[in-house]
């Protein structure tokens, strides 16, 4: 919205013949998304359908979460199977020029080809906390109804890739532990097969390298998807001041996830809602006085 309104990097605005209201090179920059990678775990028997309820916070800089019981019918697999169900949400995993309608249709086709048995168990995922890799948002045209181009540059920073590798290795240790013996059989050989299986089962837009799971780094790159915690682009001190007022203009604030340098660990919607309420009350009290009670 700022870019379309003429607030942003001058060169980017002038390229689309947008009148420059304020030249700020930081608008749309410094964006990030917490990359997520998951390993699908086949169960020996039926499992209870369960969304993520517990988060394991490790010293490795990754969060470990789990979900189970998705895909109780063929239709549910093709149309909805948990965190990997949104076609558009995965477009950020490929370069902007490759984000075509044909790519989306190919993605949908791959979803339909996934075996029903793949979703009789569940999955364990790891996501990177506070990613170092940064991206940006840029306009494709001046039509407000069209999506902009967003690139997060997953794993561009080597520290993020190292953390993903450590997280996947930790999950592999978990599924080979005594605790999984009654529900899933995941010895070393089986775990390698599950990793290969997970490469195909993770339905993103990234070209796959199956049978290459000895390279955990490649597994991370092949199976990365969004967990919808993207943030940044209007950072405090660069685009807005500590009261979230846009620097260089009057009577304009931003209160959303674009302010975050780091996204809260789980469900950032709650934090955004809290910020909205806080700023709403602050504005009312600034106008009407501290005695305002809401």
Residue map of PLM features:
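Short, small-residue-rich loop/turn micro-motifs
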Residues: 141-143, 257-258
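Conserved, non-catalytic sequence blocks in retroelement Pol enzymes and Pol-derived host proteins
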Residues: 155-163, 265-270
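Short FAD-binding loop at a beta-strand-to-alpha-helix junction that anchors the flavin cofactor
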Residues: 248-264
